[in-house]
Every structure is written in C-alpha cells, then in structure tokens.
C-alpha cells in the first residue's frame, strides 16, 4: 500500500506533514484506514505499507486504531510511485518469493468493499 505524498493537493485539510490519506473524510475515518479495513480477512495477507518519514507515526497510529497489523516500510527518500512499488516488491519477495502482490494507493474511496474483495 502506497502511503507517501506531501499533502499538498487537499490543502488546507492536508499539509506538508499531514497527507490527505490520513485526514478523516466526511466525519468518518481516514482513507488510509478505510483501505486497511478493505484488506482485512483471509483474502489478503498482512499489508506492506510504504510510507515516508513524515507520515510513519501517523500511519502506525491509524493502523493500530483500526486493529490492522501492517509491515511499515520507510522510504529512504521520496522517489515517487515506481520506487515505492519496487521497495514493497523487494519486501514481499523476501517474505514469500512466490507471492502475488497487489499495489494499492492509500487514499482511494471505494464505497463497495464487497465488490472490491471479489
């Protein structure tokens, strides 16, 4: 799960050190938390969350709030999507060389979680 970004697209809700995926939407949970909930259950393995240093504590706290166990991997330096995906792929290959990965942004709104899981 890609959990980076600088938080500049949804200003003033998001800011440099508070990216939009961590901001509660419409009085509910943050999109990051919604994404973690969609990954709960037997169809998905423990998520690998790739985050920048600025959001590492927020990601860990919000994962704990929804009871999600994650492998939090910090980007040594923000290098956009491909580098984050490559980092997650290396971690996944170390976990299980035969695993199939699913790349997810942490800020998408998907109202039908059942359809997503299918």
Regions found by a protein language model. Name each.
Residues 1, 9-16, 24-117:
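Conserved N-terminal catalytic core of the sugar/cofactor nucleotidyltransferase
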């Amino acid at each position: 799960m890609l959990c980076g970004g600088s938080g500049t697209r949804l200003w003033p809700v998001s800011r440099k050190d508070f990216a939009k995926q961590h901001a509660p939407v419409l009085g509910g949970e943050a999109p990051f938390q919604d994404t973690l909930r969609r990954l709960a259950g037997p169809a998905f393995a423990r998520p690998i969350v790739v985050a920048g240093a600025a959001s590492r504590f927020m990601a860990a706290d919000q994962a704990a709030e929804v009871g999600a166990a994650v492998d939090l991997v910090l980007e040594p330096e923000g290098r956009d999507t491909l580098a984050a995906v490559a980092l997650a792929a290396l971690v996944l290959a170390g976990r299980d060389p035969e695993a199939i990965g699913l790349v997810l942004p942490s800020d998408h709104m998907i109202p039908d979680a059942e359809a997503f899981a299918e």
